[in-house]
Amino acid sequence: MSRSTALLPLLLLSTAAVAHDHDHLHYQATSPAPAQSAPQRTPAERNAVITATLPEDQAAMKAHVMFLASDAMAGREAGTRDYDIAAQYVAAQFYAAGLRPGGDEGGYLQKVPLVAYRVADKGSAMWTPAGGQPQELVFGEDFVPSPVPNAKETSLSAPVVFVGHGIDAAPYGLNDYKGVDVRGKIVAFLPGTPEGLGGEERAFFGSAANKAALAAARGAVGAIQIDMPRAGGRQRPFATLARYYDAPRVTWANPDGTAHAMTPATPVLGTLSQAGAAKLFGKGWDAVVKAAASAKPAYKPLVARGALTVASKTGFKPMDSGNVIGLIPGSDPKLKDEVVVLSAHLDHIGTNDGGEGDRINNGALDNAIGIASLIEEAKRFKTAATPPKRTVMFLAVAAEEKGLVGSDYFANHPTVPLKSIVADVNLDMPILTYKFEDMVVFGADRSTLGPIVRKAVGAMGLPVSPDPMPEEGIFVRSDHFRFVQKGIPSVFLWPGQAGPGKAAVADFMSHRYHKVGDEIDQGIDWSQGPRFVSVNYAIAREIADAPERPVWNKGDYFGTLYKGPMAAK
């Protein structure tokens, strides 16, 4: 799973997120916590744990994780040979399970043309006040540039308008654009969101990419973020941004070799410091600083009298990867052309640079065990007494840890008609180190998938519990959200936190998440693997065989925003 938006430095909020709208979640420029590996054992002791005899169904899941989370896979980072080997393994398992290929040219693989992009120089920024002389904005003191995904060179000059947090969310009583004309202008906004938004909404509206999209829809020609520690929750000095200004980002490539951008006509140009903002907005900026320090900040629009000119260069490096796709055709004459997608990400974060000792982030729970569940779920479908009524797609995606890139590529280049996809059920990082007593299904309350999920989970003797971490905004942080952005009802499954779950999840997230300790011998309860698969299968089967396709609940924000099928009442 991608990192929480709360953990991201401002740099990535203003740059990496422009290509992938969760500020994603997946980038890591924060200082890493000290690595904690699995309990120290001798090689013989470790092998005894790994090779311990298990029942056949548990051993089948463990075998997948043994391979995918082995040191030989070097952390399965997308764009590497190690990931490619892992993808071939999944393709072979899909073949062995009897799935039909659903990728390119009759195969199981869908090529995903990844591209890394980064600022190629420090660029330049110049502020020319109305009737005054040009003033340079000093790199690292006033301004830090962002890479522009879809252009090797960028040069833009336009007036600037400050619009608070840059949010327009009418259902929540927020509209920073009220009475403001930003056509032909550069929009400047603060990071983060106002207080009072729920976790999912806060994560969504706080995304720099989504803010740029709002600006683009209103005719803005560019966007720039303004550093405000109180407003964005960040306490690092602005100079820290300069150290990471040229850190690479990853997305999928356009045919010309540039990178995909959500808002190609409205690039995020970089980040202004408070000193830089003061140069643009003069004494008017004092009111913003004062408001940011208040208990309940409220910002008024500001127009900078003059023009901001920004020039920068972006470099690109291609690095191919791939999704893995298998299909079980539907059996019902009326429903077989509709597709239920079951997704899980195959990649992890690779190896740590430098240092001594273990440097491999094996990703056993994140997300080798999710892929193992997907493979075993495919076997359940193939060996069932009757085939599903709808077609079921098993989708192992690349580059989730880079910003949901593989799923975004698939959503924009589907191998089946996009309109035929009726739902996505996503598996990402099930923490199976305890006997789970409930299930958490993120997004269940947003569509008619909710009753389907509750029926299936209830038949397994388990309750569906509410989101235990609403502040994390998990619904917008994994691959299913790329389907949501296409208007497709989607859910994301996790074992719940009842009983021992809360302590187990906290232990994993604190000590092994995105660290070298996420290994096969960390204490996984393999008896829970088949249970988790059974729950997933029951949910997917209910969706695949339901007489009606899922629709969004009437008035749901994301269903409305992305124009998905909506319930009548």
Residue locations for each model-derived region?
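Noncatalytic luminal/extracellular "stalk/propeptide" segments of secretory-pathway proteins
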Residues: A74-P194, V303-A304, F316, D320-N323
